[in-house]
Regions:
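Active-site residues of response regulator receiver
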Residues: 8, 55
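Two-component/phosphorelay signaling modules centered on CheY-like receiver
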Residues: 11-32
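Helix N-cap/capping motif at the beta->alpha junctions
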Residues: 33-42, 63-66
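Conserved phosphotransfer cores of two-component systems
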Residues: 45-48, 70-76, 97
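Receiver (REC) domain active-site loop signature in two-component systems and cognate sites
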Residues: 58
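Interdomain helical linkers/hinges and coiled-coil/dimerization scaffolds
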Residues: 107-163
Length: 163
């Protein structure tokens, strides 16, 4: 995993979650911290983020609004929502809008670890699929470039298969 965005308005809680993330054993190249949803959205607009852990209740822009805004972006991170409110309606609304995990406060280190491991597995699967698609596209391109007797119909069929 390259980047994780941690969005939590309470500094002590944010620091505690960061320590749990760092000690999880899951390799993360960069952890970025924000204290509100608006700052997080600005970061998400400027660079790809693999995973985001976000609080629900925050100033300026809460986690629910942040998750809604993320749906408009091209690159969407895997999202875990963290909340002190154990309300079913919150969880359902967030899950419908792209949140994969809902973590209740107080945050448990094992839940953080399992969530990171799950997200890391999803990221590895995505990267493997992208690599496979690139390899197939490269092979198809080689075929089209090196065979002089290839027909227009064959080229169109190859292009249709790669979509």
């Amino acid at each position: 995993m390259n980047t994780l965005l941690l969005v939590e308005d309470e500094k002590i809680i944010r620091q505690g979650i960061r320590i749990m993330i760092e000690r999880s054993g899951v390799e993360i190249k960069e952890i970025i911290e924000c204290n509100n949803g608006l700052s997080a959205l600005e970061i998400l607009k400027t660079r790809p983020i693999d995973v985001m852990f976000t609080d629900i209740r925050m100033p300026k822009m809460d986690g629910i609004q942040l998750v809604d805004e993320i749906q408009k972006l091209d690159h969407k991170p895997l999202i875990a929502a963290i909340s002190g409110f154990d309300e079913f309606d919150y969880a359902v609304n967030l899950m419908r809008n792209g949140v994969t995990e809902y973590i209740s406060k107080p945050v448990d280190r094992e839940i953080i670890k399992k969530t990171l491991e799950k997200f890391n597995g999803v990221i590895e699967e995505r990267e493997s699929e992208q690599s496979r698609r690139k390899k197939v596209a490269y092979q198809q391109l080689q075929y089209m470039l090196f065979y002089d007797d290839i027909t227009k119909v064959e080229i169109e069929n190859i292009c249709l298969k790669s979509e």
